[in-house]
Amino acid sequence: MSILDIFKSVDINKEVNRCRTTKGSVLLAVRTEGEYRQGHIGGSRNIPVEKIDNAVNLLHDKSAPIFVYCQSGSRARKAASKLRKLGYVEVYNIGGFEQYQGQLQRGKR
């Protein structure tokens, strides 16, 4: 993470659209399973931040673009940093679910 990451404003709505148009990308929610079931962005996968070390078992392609979000942005920042340390090369912290304006899905998927 660079100093610019701290001050850069990210529009989760634009980033979700970018994810959906980027070939092979993964939209990753690092919220708790309960938060995810209550509402999530369609097409996202859920790996709670405390289980992010297990990502290597679920996200096999370390070169695939990964767009990470959480509730407010802080867990996404932590997870994105950890994913980079695990060898994932194209990881984007797209911020917090609170700012998302699109339609939500409920339940596990």
Regions found by a protein language model. Name each.
Residues 2-18, 22-25, 33-64, 74-109:
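Rhodanese-like catalytic fold shared by cysteine-dependent sulfurtransferases
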Residues 29:
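N-terminal glycine-rich beta->alpha transition that marks the start or flank
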Residues 69:
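Short, surface-exposed ligand- or partner-binding patches at beta-edge/loop junctions that are enriched
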